[in-house]
Amino acid sequence: MIWTLAPFVALLPLVTAQQVGTTADAHPRLTTYKCTSQNGCTRQNTSVVLDAATHFIHKKGTQTSCTNSNGLDTAICPDKQTCADNCVVDGITDYASYGVQTKNDTLTLQQYLQTGNATKSLSPRVYLLAEDGENYSMLKLLNQEFTFDVDASTLVCGMNGALYLSEMEASGGKSSLNQAGAKYGTGYCDAQCYTTPWINGEGNTESVGSCCQEMDIWEANARATGLTPHPCNTTGLYECSGSGCGDSGVCDKAGCGFNPYGLGAKDYYGYGLKVNTNETFTVVTQFLTNDNTTSGQLSEIRRLYIQNGQVIQNAAVTSGGKTVDSITKDFCSGEGSAFNRLGGLEEMGHALGRGMVLALSIWNDAGSFMQWLDGGSAGPCNATEGNPALIEKLYPDTHVKFSKIRWGDIGSTYRH
């Protein structure tokens, strides 16, 4: 996922529970399903939490934020310990005001909130919590499939409704310096290695980057879509510095992506096309191993769609002189690519085997208008229609709906 503005990860508190503040987080319920070939799909009483940086993190006993336009307020946070002593995180009680709504097994994410004549940009990002509400749900997807329904019909050019996996810690990095943990959305990381004010819930007083493996199952709007693994040659959250955070560093920032339009299938995905984004459809992603076991080596990432009861095979495209319809070692074999230098599918598979956290978000891109996803050779959108100012003016109701999120044995999550 290529963010142009770093999403902030928050700190939180030290030894006493008071450091978490007096307002508990609401954690909207979102039913998900775990599936097996033998027993079908079982309901899970899971919930979501907004990223910690969305929460108000302030100096204890005051309304003074622990961050400013330059990052951490160094008067409050001169070092990690003092930062943890000083800063408190407040829970969020009204998720709708942050663009997040759930109903049974459906999650709706809104980009904008309209109040009277005013429009506020929100860009919410949430993580899936386990049934205990204290830890993230850890998805182990080797030789498994992940499936969801999506309504992307209002996601115009320049928007990105994303569903992806991050190798965060189950606890959100909970520690003596971070008593908030996953319950308050701490611990975010991805393959872009951004330098954020907080890392694993602790003040980033040394200005390091936060890296981890990232599996972009779904980055899309109504006009284009991408499926992209981003391996790193590290395990879990890794704090980078200098060149280790850059394009030649520990993570593959670009990834090895499968975008049907970008690979030549220009009539496959979009309004009124084979996968018709005017309507809701189902997305199935399979993580196949070399020996068809959950302990094998990741060898292929396959994609299927289902719409109006019909299974739609992934677009068959030409790459490297061959017809391909999935992500394999051969597909990603570009000479000198960071993907292969950093371990490729095998390394990505290690993270999928250890367990990854599900993140869901909506955002737009003031830096490049999301052209890397849907413009130029990647999609049909022109150079300016993804401008967030234009989207806000013309499409203030842009949103994404994810529903019926389920995962389990290959072939167990859909009818075929």
Curated annotation (Swiss-Prot):
List, alphabetically, the InterPro entries matched: ConA-like_dom_sf, Glyco_hydro_7, Glyco_hydro_7_sf
Catalytic site: 214, 219
Localization, UniProt: Secreted
Q: Where are the transmembrane segments?
A: none
| Keywords linked to the UniProt accession | Carbohydrate metabolism, Cellulose degradation, Glycoprotein, Glycosidase, Hydrolase, Polysaccharide degradation, Secreted, Signal
Temperature profile of activity? Optimum temperature is 45 degrees Celsius. Stable up to 50 degrees Celsius.
Q: What do the Gene Ontology cellular component annotations say?
A: extracellular region
Keyword Amino-acid biosynthesis set for record: no
Q: Which residues form the signal peptide?
A: 1-17
Catalyzed reactions per annotation: Endohydrolysis of (1->4)-beta-D-glucosidic linkages in cellulose, lichenin and cereal beta-D-glucans
> So what does this one do?
Has endoglucanase activity on substrates containing beta-1,4 glycosidic bonds, like in carboxymethylcellulose (CMC), hydroxyethylcellulose (HEC) and beta-glucan. Involved in the degradation of complex natural cellulosic substrates.
UniProt record similarity statement: Belongs to the glycosyl hydrolase 7 (cellulase C) family.
Q: What is this protein called?
A: Endo-beta-1,4-glucanase celB
- Whichever gene encodes this chain, its name is celB
